[in-house]
Amino acid sequence: MNKLRKFSSELKFHDRPTRAHMLFDKYKEILTGSVLDVGADAMYMQKLILSQDVKYVGIGYGENIDFEVNLEDLPLNFESNSFETVLCFDVLEHLENLHQMFDELCRISDKYVIISLPNPWKDFFSVLLKGDYSIDESMKFYGLPVQMPKDRHRWFFSESDAIRLISELAKKNNYTVIQQDSDGDSLPLGGRGIYGMVARLILRLLFRKDINTCALSHGTSYYVLQKNE
């Protein structure tokens, strides 16, 4: 996997609309021709991509969605190689059919697939250090809430698990992962000061040697896949 970062953005975000601006700024070089946004939610990417004179289609459930689609119901109703780039942000972790959906993203794309996945280990680590997510639930999208949730994550995994999964499924579908990065991966766990150094040392002593303690502070991870010629 290429560690050089071809795609980056200096924009900060604090909610979904500002995150869409960051993602567009980061990947605009390959958001060309035609883009399929799988799980487009409130279509935050739509205006940004259309402003570049690029065809954009958003599917899933959400406000002003182009096509309402149950993403558990596969295959998706699109021809193979019908979009230059396929986006799938914050979606796969919600699906029972994660592996089949991954194959569909690769089938529909003519060149690029961009995927994001959360880091549940980081969320769990934060709960241990800082407390529960809310009064009613220890972790967002996990746990055993009293009321049946409208939505939840189906999978619990580490950043290393996610990297391995994406790499293997990409290879299976004749793609190469040309970039992987994560929110917060430029700053080591606990920061660069003495406190951070001591904290990382303690964790290395407490945890198994193969645990990447720095990854416990990483947020969402992003993967850019390119179809092999």
Where do the PLM segments sit?
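Conserved phosphate-coordination/catalytic loops
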Residues: 13-18, 92-96, 156
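Conserved SAM-binding loop
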Residues: 24-126, 222-227
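Class I SAM-dependent methyltransferase Rossmann-like catalytic core
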Residues: 1-28
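S-adenosyl-L-methionine-dependent methyltransferase catalytic module, highlighting the catalytic core
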Residues: 96-229
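Amphipathic alpha-helical segments that form well-ordered structural scaffolds
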Residues: 22-26, 48, 161-169
